[in-house]
């Protein structure tokens, strides 16, 4: 190369290096803008998610918010409220990357106070640049995205709308985000909570939940996997293979062709436990119970004994074998010796506790002491077991005396005499 060409080569090299440096600087700026735009898009998605949660919260609590707001005084919804009610996940942060905090201000519509409208506004933190506000307002997908540039007015993306913050009782500053939720938007949210969706909506289990009774108009529910309910009322039949109940089963009547097995008690409040065909109650474990096989007797299954620490009471008690008592035999009713009785062989007691037995149709003592009574009266002497003449009087006076039981076996004794002086001795067996 000639010496006079060297300067041109150096100049060309420097120019090339300058161009490369300019391209690098330009590319770095483009990359910086790209990264910044992606960050703003992420912020817009977070605002959209927050606004969607606020929209659902308003729809769910529409009536409550109507009662706590006016056309000028808002009901304020915070991030904490949305997290506590499950509309936002517990990990959602209270502030965004710039330290701004989102809140929703809900008021009644001035033209139609029965309707609600709301605005989501960010406050505090570091203001966004205008470029970021314009970009984020366009990227917000829930509600109408906007921004606050003068601290008093919310302006929509592409300046499509403008609303004073004071209309919603909201306060903020320059460089903050605003999202408008119109009356139509919130009415739709309220309807979402009342509409039953046929398919599952991720994150919205409330859309598959009924909040009132449903009338099927006598139509069927077919191909049901499981029916979970607190109670059930059926005017017709219930057909099935098996049934498991952890609580009560109630009905006017029930018919079972085979067996009914209960893990607990079977109770009847006002009715009977009715069996038929010589059946009754049976304890399967021990083989005892009660049944009737005729119209007269309640019988013990397998001739089992009946045991109780209380009383067994009846009109009469009959033992075909021996009658045992582990203590004493107490006869409560009393009889009178000499009174009539039937049948022979009855055992009783008098009022002093002495044992009497029915002998020949008359209550009489069993063993005991003889009581002798001497009587001088004439005529009826009384009731005694036996009477005899104890004294006749004077034989030289041709005196006679007679003692007789009349009628025979009646224990009624009489004394007859010609003159006085005859004494009768009568015996009573105590």
Swiss-Prot record:
The keyword Acetylation appears for this protein: no
Record's keyword terms, sorted: Plasmid
Region (Constant region) residue spans: 1-361
UniProt entry tagged with the keyword Protease: no
Source domain of life: Bacteria
Stretches for region Variable region: 362-430
SUPFAM superfamilies: Enolase N-terminal domain-like
Pfam families cross-referenced by the UniProt entry: Shufflon_N
Additional note from the record: This protein is expressed by a shufflon (= clustered inversion region that works as a biological switch). The orfs of this region share a constant N-terminus, while the C-terminus is variable.
Protein name from the UniProt record: Shufflon protein A'
Organism in which the protein naturally occurs: Escherichia coli
